[in-house]
Each structure stands twice: as structure tokens, then as C-alpha cells.
């Protein structure tokens, strides 16, 4: 990594309301990104502004491969590179700089200045761990003797060779560090200097002939026991890097002092670039611009009342979960329960223990602010674009329900869903499908603070039902072979199952027997770290089937984004989705628009509905998916299409905990949910950990016994997951 990186970028300015060319200089040692109106102005030292990188967070847009943001000092600066490769180079250099100075920030904020004695203590610890590793290495010989086949033996031998190489590297590092310590002691005693590692808070300017040790930080893995990080009083430190110059930009001419590489050690002939006029002594207290014309999202921090500052602790546990293979592993729910028993124990979201599902969790905004340091720790462990599937997440950010239960909220307006089959004309049915689809997302996000639902366990089940308005279930005929066998045939029933853990795939099914309509879907959630945001790609599809008309409407799902993760997180949807009916030829294109940083509204959608073989839509829709959407027809008619503010949410009904099977969502997660409800984060984390450990043990047992996992209610059909006993199949059996 070069200590000075420079090149052109465009920066958004509010004065011009657009992008303006600037020449940027990144000083790795100072932790400072300075910019100038031109390269000539840079050589004359006429700095336009600067961005302080200590404690900064980089963000990217998942739908734009050239722009990125830097959030620091309660401001968000927006930049644009020439292309994706250019952006990647800048982001890599910025991440390395931020990581270095964030680590320094920990030590400075704690008032701890590491001494040679601390360094020596760490060396002793490293040597002790090395001896343990060497002892463990001997176990490979026993493992090799027990190998049953050549393939297994080859894997163990490869692992042994890799471990041997790692041991030798560690030995070499310890020896070099010991030599460096001895040399440092000798030099400092000769000069009468107290033996301490100097904290780097100002711009480091070594002499041209000064030998420098490069300790460029690299990405670190999440610790297996994050709680230990809170207890440790030792803080990492790093030594400054020697002067090396690199220039970003394909059309720029390298300067005479450029080396083109940051990995090789600097030679004694290298000198700091003379044409870079940086502040001679200190890094500015805050990021600034001479005209303060940056575009920044100040209101993001205004909502929370503070800005990101400290990194002091960590909590959480891994989310690698598997299936419970206990005695309750029934293939289907018990269908012998009486209606009176089941319904007397039925509960809506507003009752007792489950009341948390229907209230806005506004009061929990404080918990996000309270645990901001944990989020900062997470940010320091991940890279932009990194898959978050296996990343440890702190317990406090969890929402008190499973992802499977969240999918049930697609049917918070079951009356709109069943009314699809009431339409007599295929055009009206397509319009009604779109209406139900656009109403399906807002109910899942009723709180003002976005949180993450539990990752479902392999084999986890969630089932519920809805009673339609103006309908009564008294003396009603039961749908005994349906997914929820204790409810009436006029209800909408729902069941979901986690059918795969790697990759994480959820399958869910809903139906209304009397209306002869069903819905089958599967979603593979793939999360990605975007800096100030987290993106979740919902890969998969759903199918609405109107059995009376033999019509099947195939639809896709938008992606989700968790924004402002350092302040008050909020959710938005983004991406283009489609709905198609192959039998009738009707189709719809729906676009969920993410909020652009240079203006615009949140939560916008636009949609077009097309007749068969028509390139021009007969209905255009626009508005907000969590607000009001308006429709404009080709006839000139304008009307409110969906008003989610006025649509009553019909509460789902779920059996009480004592009547649920062990593998049902609320039963599985009851201890975690209860402790989150009373805000006992430690107890919630412990409950989550116990659940995970049990599942891991059962997964190992299946592997040792070579037992394949069998799903409960769904099966794989090509690239889709299909419910075993859909209404279509059951009605077909009755006809025959």
C-alpha cells in the first residue's frame, strides 16, 4: 500500500447541483483525503477541502458501480470514479487507511499507550499459542492412520502441510519481532529515550534515509468469542509506513518518485513527493471544504442526536443453525386436534406474549444508539461487497420473530388476495394480482427502527391463518388436509419451512379452499455489506394460482436494503420485478426505486400493466409502496390504486406456545424472544447460543451416520420448492 495515493475523482456539490472534477490525494499516514480543483492547484498547495478518515465509513450503491460515499464528522461525502475498477482501487486504499487509523483511535481514546513491556507480553502469549498449535499438529498423524480412503487421506495431508507452513511462518514472525524489539531497545537506550511506541496522531514525516517497518493492516476475522474483546484492555497499535507514492487514473503520468507498488519495502533513496503540499503538522479537527458545498445527509445523524465515535466492545453469536432431530420431527402437523381445542388456544398478534408483533418499536431506537460501538466493530471486520451469510451479528439488532413469520405478512390483506379469484375477466384478475402484490410489503415493516429477523433453523416451521372480514368460523367445515388443518375452509391458511441452510432458502405456501386460490413461493436470501447499508437480494419466485381458471401468475420479489445502520436504521426496497401469466398473456413490470442521494423521495414505485401482445400499457401506477399508489388507465381514468394507510391490517392467528410443536418458530425462539422483550441482551444471546449448539450437534450426528436431511412439508422440483399437498393436487384427487 502506497503511503500517498492520488488521482482524479468527481465530487458532488450542492452549489452546482452536480458532479465536479477534483484532484484527490490520499495520505495513508495522516489518515486524510485532500482534494483540489486541479493537479496544478495541488502542487501549489491550494487545498479545496479534506475528509478526515479516522472513524469514517465507506458506502457503495449496489445498483451503481462507479459511485461511493464516505461518512464522517456527521457528513456524507459523495464521490464518482470513472468506472468500477477505478472505484475498487480507491475503496481498497481508503479501507486500509480507515482500518489503520480506527485501530489507533481505540488506543488513543482509552488513554492506553503501549510500551515495550506490553509488546513483550504479547510476544510471550504468541509463543505460548504457537506451542499449543505445534502440539495440535501432532494429532494429524493419528488422523492419517484412521483414514478409510485415499480421498480423505489426501485432504488430511493437505491440511497438515498447510498447518506446517503456517507454523513455520509464525515462528519466523516471532523471531523477527524479537530482533526488532532488541534493536529498538538498544537504539533507545543509546539515545536516552524512554521505550514506548509513539502514538501517531499527526502527519508522520520520516527522514529520507530512515528505515521503516511496514505493518499494513489486513482484514481480520470475527473473533470466536466477541465478548472477550470487551474485557481486553490491550489495544492494537501499528507503526507508520514509509513514503511511497502511487497514482490512480489511467491517463495520469507517474511522477518521478512513483514506485507503482506498495508491497515492496521502500529503498533508502525514496523521499516524500515534493509536489504534495500537505498540512505540515496536524490533521484537521473536522473534515471541511472551503465553500462547504458538499452534499451530505446531515439529517441521518440529526435523528439519532450523535455521530459514530467509539469502538469499544462486541457481542453476539454465530448463526450457523441446523435442524432439530428430536422426537417431534413429524412430517405433517397433527390433524386430529378438535376445532374447539385449537381455536380456543388460537392467538392473534395482539394477545399477551405475542403483542410485540403489532406495535411500533419506536422505543428501541435507543438500543441502536446504545450499542453503536458493536456495529462499529462489525464494520471493522467486513469488506464492501462481502457476503454476510456467515458473519456474526450482535443479538440486540434482532427483531423478535423469525424470517418465516415475516413472510406471513405478505398476506396481511387476505381479502385482497382471495378477491383475485372473484374477478370474472382475465384483465381484472391481473389488475387484482398487482393490487395484492403492491399491498403485500408494507405490513412487514410497522416499526420505525429496522431490525433483522431470526435466521430460521433448518426444518423450522411457521403456520398461521387469517379469518376474512365478515366471516365466522363457528360450525364451519374444516380443511382437514390443508396446511393448517384446524381452521375453516373459508380462511386463508399459511405455512412456511426453512428447507435449506446453505444456501438459506425459505419456502412458503398459502391457500383459501373455498376461493380455490393458492400461492407457492421460495426465497433465497443473499446479504451483502454496502458500507452504510446492508443489501439483501431476494432470489426466487412465487406463483399465484387461480384454480378455477387454471391461471398461474409467476412473480419475483424486490431486494431489501437496511440504510443508516449507524444511526436509526430504516428499510427500503429496490429492484425491478415482473408478474406474468402465460395462459392469458397479461404481464406487469414493477420497479421499486431506491432513494437517490441527490434528491428524490423514499419508497417510490412505478408499475405498468400490459395486455397480451401490447407494447403500450393499459394501466400505469406510481406512488409509495408503504403509502398511497395511484393508477392512470389508458382510458384517461385516474384513481387511487392502493392506499396502505387506510387498508386495515388483518391480524394473523397463531396457536399458543403450549400447543405448538417444538420445531415451530415461536416455540423454538421463545427464550430469545422473551429476553429481547425485557431487554436482557446477555440472556437472549445465551439462549440463542444454546439453540445453535444443539442444532450443530445434531447436524454432526447426521453427518456421522450419513443421514440425509428430509424436508417436512416441501420438496424440490427443478429450481423451485413446492408444497407437498397443494390445493391443486387435493382437488385433482377428489375429481378422480
Swiss-Prot record:
Residues covered by region (Disordered): 209-368
Chain positions found as N-acetylalanine: 2
SUPFAM superfamilies named in the record: Oxysterol-binding protein-like, PH domain-like
Biased composition annotated in UniProt, kind: Low complexity: 253-274
Listed GO CC annotations: Golgi apparatus; late endosome membrane
Location within or outside the cell: Late endosome membrane; Golgi apparatus, trans-Golgi network membrane
Modified residues (Phosphoserine): 306, 324-326, 329, 611
Biological role stated in the UniProt entry: Interacts with OSBPL11 to function as lipid transfer proteins. Together they form a heterodimer that localizes at the ER-trans-Golgi membrane contact sites, and exchanges phosphatidylserine (1,2-diacyl-sn-glycero-3-phospho-L-serine, PS) for phosphatidylinositol-4-phosphate (1,2-diacyl-sn-glycero-3-phospho-(1D-myo-inositol 4-phosphate), PI(4)P) between the two organelles, a step that is critical for sphingomyelin synthesis in the Golgi complex.
PANTHER family in alphabetical order: OXYSTEROL-BINDING PROTEIN-RELATED, OXYSTEROL-BINDING PROTEIN-RELATED PROTEIN 9
Subunit structure, interactors included: Heterodimer with OSBPL11. Interacts with OSBPL10.
Name of the protein described by the UniProt record: Oxysterol-binding protein-related protein 9
Organism the protein comes from: Mus musculus (Mouse)
Amino acid at each position: 500500500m502506497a503511503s500517498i495515493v492520488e488521482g482524479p475523482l468527481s465530487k458532488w456539490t450542492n452549489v452546482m447541483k452536480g458532479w465536479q472534477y477534483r484532484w484527490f490525494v490520499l495520505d495513508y499516514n495522516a489518515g486524510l483525503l485532500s482534494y483540489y480543483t486541479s493537479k496544478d492547484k495541488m502542487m501549489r498547495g491550494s487545498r479545496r477541502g479534506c475528509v478526515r478518515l479516522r472513524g469514517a465509513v465507506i458506502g457503495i450503491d449496489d445498483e451503481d458501480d462507479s459511485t461511493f460515499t464516505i461518512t464522517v464528522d456527521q457528513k456524507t461525502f459523495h464521490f464518482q470514479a470513472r468506472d468500477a475498477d477505478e472505484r475498487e482501487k480507491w475503496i481498497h486504499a481508503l479501507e486500509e487507511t480507515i482500518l489503520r487509523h480506527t485501530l489507533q483511535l481505540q488506543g488513543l481514546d482509552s488513554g492506553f499507550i503501549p510500551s515495550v513491556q506490553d509488546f513483550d507480553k504479547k510476544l510471550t502469549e504468541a509463543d505460548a499459542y504457537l506451542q499449543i498449535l505445534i502440539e495440535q499438529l501432532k494429532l494429524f498423524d493419528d488422523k492419517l492412520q484412521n483414514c478409510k480412503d485415499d480421498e480423505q487421506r489426501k485432504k488430511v495431508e493437505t491440511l497438515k502441510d498447510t498447518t506446517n507452513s503456517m507454523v513455520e511462518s509464525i515462528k519466523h514472525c516471532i523471531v523477527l519481532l524479537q530482533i526488532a524489539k532488541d534493536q529498538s531497545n538498544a537504539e533507545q537506550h543509546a539515545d536516552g529515550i524512554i521505550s514506548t511506541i509513539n502514538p501517531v496522531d499527526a502527519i508522520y514525516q520520516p527522514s529520507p534515509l530512515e528505515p521503516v517497518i511496514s505493518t499494513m493492516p489486513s482484514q481480520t476475522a470475527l473473533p470466536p468469542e466477541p465478548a472477550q474483546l470487551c474485557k481486553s484492555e490491550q489495544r492494537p497499535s501499528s507503526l507508520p509506513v514509509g513514503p511511497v507514492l502511487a497514482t490512480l487514473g489511467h491517463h495520469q503520468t507517474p511522477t518521478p518518485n512513483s514506485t507503482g507498488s506498495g508491497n515492496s519495502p521502500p529503498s533508502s533513496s525514496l523521499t516524500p513527493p515534493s509536489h504534495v503540499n500537505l498540512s505540515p503538522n496536524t490533521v484537521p479537527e473536522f473534515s471541511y471544504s472551503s465553500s462547504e458545498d458538499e452534499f451530505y445527509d446531515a439529517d441521518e445523524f440529526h435523528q439519532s442526536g450523535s455521530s459514530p465515535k467509539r469502538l469499544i466492545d462486541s457481542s453476539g453469536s454465530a448463526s450457523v443453525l441446523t435442524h432439530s432431530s428430536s422426537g417431534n420431527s413429524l412430517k405433517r402437523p397433527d390433524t386430529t386436534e378438535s376445532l374447539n381445542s385449537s381455536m380456543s388456544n388460537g392467538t392473534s398478534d395482539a394477545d399477551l406474549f405475542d403483542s410485540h408483533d403489532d406495535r411500533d418499536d419506536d422505543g428501541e431506537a435507543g438500543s441502536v444508539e446504545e450499542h453503536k460501538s458493536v456495529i462499529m466493530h462489525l464494520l471493522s471486520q467486513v469488506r464492501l461487497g462481502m457476503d454476510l451469510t456467515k458473519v456474526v451479528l450482535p443479538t440486540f439488532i434482532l427483531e423478535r420473530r423469525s424470517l418465516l413469520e415475516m413472510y406471513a405478512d405478505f398476506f396481511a390483506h387476505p381479502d385482497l388476495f382471495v378477491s383475485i379469484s372473484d374477478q370474472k375477466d382475465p384483465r381484472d384478475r391481473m389488475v387484482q394480482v398487482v393490487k395484492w402484490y403492491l399491498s403485500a410489503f408494507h405490513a412487514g415493516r410497522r416499526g420505525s427502527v429496522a431490525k433483522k429477523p431470526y435466521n430460521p433453523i433448518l426444518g423450522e416451521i411457521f403456520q398461521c391463518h387469517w379469518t376474512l372480514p365478515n366471516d365466522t368460523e363457528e360450525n364451519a367445515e374444516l380443511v382437514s388436509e390443508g396446511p393448517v388443518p384446524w381452521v375453516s375452509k373459508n380462511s386463508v391458511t399459511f405455512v412456511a419451512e426453512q428447507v435449506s441452510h446453505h444456501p438459506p432458502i425459505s419456502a412458503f405456501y398459502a391457500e383459501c379452499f373455498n376461493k380455490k386460490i393458492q400461492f407457492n413461493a421460495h426465497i433465497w436470501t443473499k446479504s451483502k455489506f454496502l458500507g452504510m447499508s446492508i443489501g439483501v437480494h431476494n432470489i426466487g419466485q412465487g406463483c399465484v394460482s387461480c384454480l378455477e381458471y387454471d391461471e398461474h401468475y409467476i412473480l419475483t420479489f424486490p431486494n431489501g436494503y437496511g440504510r443508516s445502520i449507524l444511526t436509526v436504521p430504516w428499510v427500503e426496497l429496490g429492484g425491478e420485478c415482473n408478474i406474468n401469466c402465460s395462459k392469458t398473456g397479461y404481464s406487469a413490470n414493477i420497479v421499486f426505486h431506491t432513494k437517490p442521494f441527490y434528491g428524490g423521495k423514499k419508497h417510490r414505485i412505478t408499475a405498468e400493466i400490459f395486455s397480451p401482445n401490447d407494447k403500450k400499457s393499459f394501466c400505469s401506477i406510481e406512488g409509495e409502496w408503504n403509502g398511497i399508489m395511484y393508477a392512470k388507465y389508458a382510458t384517461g381514468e385516474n384513481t387511487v390504486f392502493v392506499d396502505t394507510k387506510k387498508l386495515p391490517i388483518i391480524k394473523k392467528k397463531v396457536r399458543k406456545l403450549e400447543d405448538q410443536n417444538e420445531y415451530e418458530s415461536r416455540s423454538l425462539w421463545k427464550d430469545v424472544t422473551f429476553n429481547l422483550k425485557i431487554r436482557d441482551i446477555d440472556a437472549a444471546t445465551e439462549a440463542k447460543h444454546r439453540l445453535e449448539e444443539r442444532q450443530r450437534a445434531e447436524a454432526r450426528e447426521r453427518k456421522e451416520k450419513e443421514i440425509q436431511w428430509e424436508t417436512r412439508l416441501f420438496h424440490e422440483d427443478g429450481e423451485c420448492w413446492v408444497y407437498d399437498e397443494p390445493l391443486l393436487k387435493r382437488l385433482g384427487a377428489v375429481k378422480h
